[in-house]
Amino acid sequence: NNFGGILQAYALCHILSNIIPQNEVYILTQKEKTFKGRLKKFLDYNSPAQKFIRQYIPINTLSGFTLNEIMKKNITCIVVGSDQVWNTKYYNPLYFLNFLEDNHTIKKISYAASLGSDLWYYSQQQTDEISNLLNKFNAISVRESSAINLLQDNLKIKATQVLDPTLLLQANHYNKFISDDNKRYCYAYLLDYTKKLNM
């Protein structure tokens, strides 16, 4: 239910579909493996965020992120991003496409990937693993200028700064999502939680 991440996924899919209309573009997700994960998904089914995803974002669910699964889907390119996919707090080798192993036929691209920090918090072991994986990418772009420096200083990898995908669409593109509901409500968009705001 990360509204920012959902809008980024929507915008990136929309842009890619316009650029390569002859190809299918969809979000890869993995089936929930734990009962707790499946229960949460079931309880969230009717949330506004999940309804939006079902209506506007093409999803393709994999039973597992393995090279065999990817090859079965005839996928030719995988794009990672945007949002804080490379934030140390959420470190997951999946976001560096480790499951593609040494496959050279599938293009690997990052679009507006974010580290979510101006400092490098990865351990040496993680840094070595990330360096190995990112060196297999065909193109790397990041959201913040600080990420360019972090990748260069810590991995000797060059990256390009690009716009967040939500900003690639005109503002009026989002008008269709705006509700005509006039009910009063309180809305808060919090990037970093604090004890005071999270009460």
Describe each region flagged by the PLM.
Residues 102, 151-154, 199:
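Short loop/helix-cap segments at secondary-structure boundaries that form the rim of catalytic
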